[in-house]
């Protein structure tokens, strides 16, 4: 069993029990901090250059990204991300009607990557992405319904025993591709298509039973856009408190997404972000409907300082209304296309640390850190004196000190261990090197004097000293 978890002052839940918490989506989203999207990877399609019959999983790297690894997700978790969207294109990976059987190789690979995310103790969002069969035209509706039901039944069965840390997202940006209404908020034809598909998706997952009866589900507006037409004609299912609205917002457009005339590299006006958040709040949040912004971002224009300010502003606004956000990372850093890369997936180097810093700063007092537990063994040094002495940091968090220096598991910074099946704090005497404050790699100083810390977050790892956030170590 993998022991992977989040420390808090209130609870300690071990992933692996598969017990499904019966909580509303309004409660669930409170535990989501910053999200990261595995863009241009499992959603990549290369029908003209790949022989899908010979190799079903080659498409993962056919748009230029490297094979996804567990270490990538551990790195992201260490940086503060706890929500991981996994965009997935199923076309090319399933058979003909009427079964539309998903290829076993492909399902296995998708399952592996979902586990990479879950293994951090965070949340995974699995979806249906760059499909052509669900373009939102009436002529496609009946065939699209059949495929949607078949694909989601198989996905639901594959992950039937997964708990609330796995979220299903029915569709990605369903819209009338190639039509004048494609990105303009839709029309009656498009709205009806999306509403019927959303309703069918929810009913399909619920009918599979087991944990899926309580599965948290995300459904989009038309094109997942924040537009009066799309939102006013969106139908949210009644009587189901485990459904979340999925929205995308690359705002301000000219700063964040526009790659042509009118594009700007300076962030000086947050009015578009304000409008988006005010709309979300008035249309959904104020009515008790939870929202996740499943995609947002600002492409690289050699303007990292501006993107840092933008990220802090964006996340601060979203956090103020209780909306978690998932940044889009397509793995591209240079060139003429969309440059939304954040982390080098080969070296695990954060290419734009200031941008990450802005995201974390935007969380403000809502910041929560997640600890990824990995199987290691601490080394007893000549200075080690294993005792029952409880004079270590974990006592203040409600956990005893580890009796010895050799424990079954430690977290990534070596501060927490598992001993006799229980979490415990590892004493500083178990290391002959000075402890390095983990917050420095996120751009925050160490707290200099814990007695002067005037505020701590709920897991006691972050503090406020002299008006500034600092890491407690």
Curated annotation (Swiss-Prot):
Active site (UniProt): 173 (proton donor), 295 (nucleophile)
The UniProt record lists the keyword Repeat: yes
GO molecular function: beta-glucosidase activity; cellulase activity
Residue numbers spanned by region Catalytic: 18-367
Reaction equation(s) it catalyzes: Endohydrolysis of (1->4)-beta-D-glucosidic linkages in cellulose, lichenin and cereal beta-D-glucans
CBM10 domain location: 391-427, 436-473
Residue span of region Linker: 365-387
GO biological process: glucan catabolic process
Disulfide partners: none
Gene3D superfamilies per the UniProt record, alphabetical: Cellulose docking domain, dockering (3.90.1220.10), Glycosidases (3.20.20.80)
Example of a GO cellular component annotation carried by this entry: cell surface
First and last residue of the signal peptide: 1-17
Protein name: Endoglucanase B
Gene: CELB
């Amino acid at each position: 069993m993998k022991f992977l978890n989040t420390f808090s002052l209130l609870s300690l839940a071990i992933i692996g029990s598969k017990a499904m918490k019966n909580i509303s989506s309004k409660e669930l989203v409170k535990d989501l901090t910053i999200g990261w999207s595995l863009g241009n990877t499992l959603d990549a399609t290369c029908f003209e250059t790949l022989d899908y019959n010979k190799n079903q999983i080659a498409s993962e790297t056919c748009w230029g990204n490297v094979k996804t690894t567990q270490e990538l997700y551990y790195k992201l978790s260490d940086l503060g991300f706890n929500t991981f969207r996994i965009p997935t294109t199923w076309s090319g990976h399933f058979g003909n009607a009427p079964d539309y059987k998903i290829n076993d190789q492909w399902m296995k690979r998708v399952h592996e990557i979902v586990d990479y995310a879950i293994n951090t103790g965070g949340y995974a969002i699995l979806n249906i992405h760059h499909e052509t069969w669900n373009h939102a035209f009436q002529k496609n509706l009946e065939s699209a319904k059949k495929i949607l039901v078949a694909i989601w039944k198989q996905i639901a069965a594959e992950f039937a025993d997964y708990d609330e840390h796995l979220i299903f997202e029915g569709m990605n940006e369903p819209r009338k591709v190639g039509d004048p209404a494609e990105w303009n908020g839709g029309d009656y034809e498009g709205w009806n298509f999306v509403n019927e598909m959303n309703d069918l998706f929810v009913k399909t997952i619920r009918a599979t039973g087991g944990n899926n009866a309580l599965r948290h589900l995300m459904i989009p507006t038309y094109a997942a856009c924040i537009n009066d037409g799309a939102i006013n004609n969106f139908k949210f299912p009644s009587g189901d408190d485990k459904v979340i609205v999925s929205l995308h917002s690359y705002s301000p457009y000219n700063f964040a997404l526009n790659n042509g005339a009118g594009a700007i590299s300076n962030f000086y006006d947050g009015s578009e972000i304000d409008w988006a958040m005010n709309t979300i709040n008035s249309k959904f949040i104020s009515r008790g409907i939870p929202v996740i912004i499943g995609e947002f971002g600002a492409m690289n224009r050699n303007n990292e300082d501006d993107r840092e300010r933008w990220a802090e502003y964006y996340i601060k606004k979203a956090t103020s209304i209780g909306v978690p956000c998932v940044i889009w990372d397509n793995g591209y850093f240079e060139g003429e296309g969309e440059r939304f890369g954040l982390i080098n997936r080969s070296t695990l180097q954060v290419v734009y640390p200031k941008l990450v810093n802005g995201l974390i700063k935007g969380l403000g007092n809502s910041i929560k850190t997640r600890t990824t537990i990995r199987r290691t063994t601490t080394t007893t040094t000549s200075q080690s004196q294993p005792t029952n002495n409880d004079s270590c940091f974990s006592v203040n968090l409600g956990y005893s000190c580890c009796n010895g220096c050799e424990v079954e598991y430690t977290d990534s910074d070596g501060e927490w261990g598992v001993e006799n099946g229980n979490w415990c704090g590892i004493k500083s005497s178990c290391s002959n090197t000075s402890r390095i404050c983990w917050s420095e790699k996120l751009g925050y100083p160490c707290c200099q004097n814990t007695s002067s810390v005037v505020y701590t977050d709920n897991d006691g790892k972050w503090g406020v000293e002299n008006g500034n956030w600092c890491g407690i170590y």
